[in-house]
Design a protein with these regions (language model features):
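Class I SAM-dependent methyltransferase SAM/SAH-binding core
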Residues: 45-99, 124
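A short glycine-rich, Lys/Arg-flanked "PGG" loop and its adjoining helix->strand segment in the class I
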Residues: 123-138
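A conserved beta-strand element that flanks and buttresses the S-adenosyl-L-methionine
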Residues: 111
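Acceptor-substrate binding/catalytic loop of class I
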Residues: 171-186
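A short His-aromatic
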Residues: 117-118
């Protein structure tokens, strides 16, 4: 997976993400603002902003927020959102999550929501967050997670490892720019190994209707059929994690999101 593939994939489907209810109004968005308790003087950065929904949610509560992304089409959507909401303190910047073009210790808050599963090098990304945060600054992360003992108890480590591999394959078939979802425990380890104090973590279930989810990135009929079979015929551990079921004749499943709030020591 290359960053150019991420740009190609999301550039082609920027409009779909601008209107996606999961990204624009998902439960994790309001919860993130609630947990962070942003200050009115704060300088904030949203990494991999996509259509700008997270930056826009924080903008009314901070002095300034930069919505950054590696994809120009997404930044255009973020600018449209800021204009529509009258957010004069929200601006955009082209930025690679693993090589941020900002000086050390610039921000009071760095956010990143439903994006790190596209990043090739998660420790590099977290290290960049550490670098650009002020001492005492807050790192607020949301991302889809893979099954592990914290999210899916009652299975062996081998069963969970296999389920995580299959789940990531499931995501990659639908979206070739997908890199890897981590488990909750792995996220916690990387964040604390970087030097952060982990202040809070929780999981949120995100109910997804299969067909719109599969179609959002333009999957063809054969790919959708393959994904449907993987979801319906998965191992017990994968089924316990994704919880596929029929609702009014339509296939639904549940993705788990991790919310992690960490602080850079003073």
């Amino acid at each position: 997976m290359t960053k150019s593939l991420v740009q190609q994939q999301f550039g082609a489907h920027a409009g779909a993400y601008a209107t996606s209810a999961v990204h624009a109004k998902g439960a994790s968005l309001g919860r993130l603002v609630e947990l962070v308790k942003p200050g009115p003087h704060w300088q904030a950065l949203d990494i991999a902003t996509g259509a700008g929904h997270t930056a826009a949610a924080f903008a009314p509560h901070v002095a300034r927020v930069i919505a950054s992304d590696v994809t120009d089409e997404m930044l255009a959507e973020a600018r449209k959102l800021a204009a529509a909401k009258g957010l004069a303190n929200m601006e955009t910047a082209s930025a690679d999550a693993e090589a941020l073009p900002f000086e050390d210790g610039r921000f009071d808050l760095v956010t990143c929501r439903i994006a790190p599963h596209h990043f090739p090098d998660i420790p590099m990304f977290v290290g960049q967050v550490w670098r650009v945060l002020k001492p005492g600054g807050t790192f607020a992360l949301v991302d889809n997670i893979a099954p592990d003992t914290e999210s899916t108890p009652g299975f062996s480590s081998t069963e969970l490892r296999d389920a995580a591999v299959t789940y990531n394959a499931f995501e990659t078939i639908r979206d070739p720019s997908h890199s890897r979802c981590l488990g909750m425990a792995e996220w916690s380890e990387i964040i604390t190994d970087t030097g952060f104090d982990l202040a809070h973590k929780e999981r949120l279930g995100k109910d997804m209707e299969f067909q719109p989810w599969a179609e959002r990135l333009g999957a063809d009929t054969a790919t959708i059929g393959r994904l449907r079979a993987m979801l319906s015929d998965g191992t017990p551990a994968l089924q316990a994690f994704l919880r596929p079921r029929l609702v009014d004749g339509n296939l639904w499943f549940t993705l788990d999101e991790a919310i992690l709030i960490a602080r850079k020591p003073q």
